[in-house]
Amino acid sequence: MRSHLPILFLIFWGGWLSAEPLRIRKGDSIVILGNTFAERMQLFGYFEVFLHSRFPDHNLRVRNMGWSADEVHQRIRPQGFPKLSAELKEHRADLLFLCFGFNESFQGATGLDHYKAELGNFLKKLQGQNFNGESAPRIVLVSPIPFEKIDKGLPNSDEGNRRIQLYTTASETVAQEHGVRFLDLFAPMLEQASNISNRKITINGVHLSEYGDWAVSQLMARGLGLWRDDLSLPTATPRDEKFRRAVYEKNHHYFTWWHPPNASYIHGGRNKTRGAMHLANEREQRKLLIEASERELWAMEKPKLSEVWGAE
């Protein structure tokens, strides 16, 4: 059983209950971009499960293109790796979730101007394209999450959070300048951390645990105006693990296709060697697995919204 979240946290969430709901359209292709926070969303999948449960007949396509250590101005890839714009066109992206600011925050106040400029340029570039062939993508800029104070042997969380606060504010400013939706996870998560003493949400002060992903998925749903139930918060393990496992399997197939362990044999200088001869065909087979997994998700009975977070 999961522990109750405090009443104070409920009150803090109350301000979000009037948030304008994010537009989710039938058949939307949703792509998640960003750093380790983004990449790890596929491990537990609570937010994606929520989307399918909230819009059970929309046949949503979700692709996690998060890459650990990515920064808005620096996304290091193997030689020959496809350009981001080409990938987004292949996925016909309608809605983008951008998760940046945490890694950049280590530059402190001196790096703020550079971050804001690069973020603005990135948003402008994305808004100038129509990956779906019809319109510019809708964009949600997601703030970094705070450090969690869990161990005296880890870096000072207060100092780190002062930096992250600067970059969260900077992200919000740039989002407003470009007419992009901003989702603040920093403030409510910091509030949660200060009011929960018996349940940690990260494994190391930075990366979310399964419980943390479960809790943050609720923050995201409320912050996007997609979940307005303020009567109570769930306290139990989710009932329908079968669907969440299916989401994980689809994401695993995609991740091993898109981000293979040794991409040099696919995109780089070794893609003509004997060992790489059959990889192109195997990748096509993997794409078929991704599509089949997605069709299976669409056909499955979706968990009720109360079951996504295990309310009892």
Regions found by a protein language model. Give the residues of each.
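Solvent-exposed loop/turn segments at secondary-structure junctions
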Residues: 36-40, 67-73, 95, 102-107, ...
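Serine-esterase "nucleophile elbow" of acetyl-processing enzymes
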Residues: 8, 18-68, 84-92, 96, ...
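Oxyanion-hole/transition-state-stabilizing segment in secreted/luminal serine hydrolases
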Residues: 33, 44-45, 53, 67, ...
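Extracellular serine-dependent O-acyl
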Residues: 135-144, 162-199, 214-237
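Structural recognition of the beta-strand scaffold that forms the well-ordered cores
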Residues: 29-33, 61-66, 94-100, 138-143, ...
